[in-house]
Amino acid sequence: MDPRLRLDVLIPTHNRAPMLERCVRSVLSATPTPRLLVHVTVICNGCTDDSRDVVRWLQMSYPGMITLLEERRRGKSKALNAAIEATGGDLVGMIDDDEEVAPEWLTVIADAFTDPHLDFIGGPYVPICDTPLPDWLPDEYLAVVGAVDNGSAPRPYGRDFPGILKGGNAVIRRRALQLVGPYAEHLGPGSFSRLFSCEDEDMYWRLLEARRVGRYYPTLVINHYIETSRLSREYFRRWCFWRGVSRGLMDRRHPLPVPYLAGIPRFLWGRAGRALLRLSRLRSRRPARDVFTDELRMWDVAGYFCGRQVYTLARFSPVASRRDGSDHGYAAMQHELARMEELAPAEERHMDDVELAG
């Protein structure tokens, strides 16, 4: 019996062939360890570029180490679920196609999972951009462009952790995934031009609710390439609104342990109200970064309200369908999302192509 842990590295991709090649090579050229048997699965999620040719060429360079999987249903969660079902390794690693892992990435994984009680790990994202980050970009919203740093020391994930297990740099034991179930397919970048997210946040809370043990490792580093199209105020506004919608949807299953007002956490109302007052009174005397931070906080709460109250899960609820044992709610939701895709303006569909795999 092979004593090595089998690591499946899953990479969903959508029309990012040049980045995809760098991503795959970074995994297979990382410092090897005799304790891991590594296999990469690339999931082409509605690709219309030459991503498949890139993967086939890489398969010749790394024989037996790369699998190409097709998932025609658009959506990162769908792609991940298909790959999780198609693979069988002890560990499931997940990265995005616009990332490169650091050379020690595999070694950190092997060291961490010598602990048989550890169920999942994550690490920081180092942003890489061809242009300087704009002065107006708020520190509070760096995660919008994929910059994540939760400190220089290992620490356990849990209710007191200042963040979540981000889906672009995560390794989870398969037995833990089998326990908590697949990624929520109504969350995350998907099939129509809305910047849904939070599929990783939903998974994180389910892991914690199942009492799975996780740890953040500052040495589990990935480098994340930032597309210049994301460095605009308009993108940040859209991202914050749709992140709010996603959190409002997720709130049905994972309510926060705080007081609520009109279905929204009361502290969000307070934060948005204070931001509105500052915007109305002090706009001309404040730094642009502070002004934009307050504006984004208002987009946050507006999206949360829409997700919680307007995108009513009474109409199409995968959460409800799990309760009653049927899939009618999920099917209705998919029908509604497909209808919205048909109505989406062409320019928003282009933005969806930019966002889908990231």
Residue spans for each PLM region:
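Conserved donor NDP-sugar-binding/catalytic core segment of glycosyltransferases
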Residues: 104-137
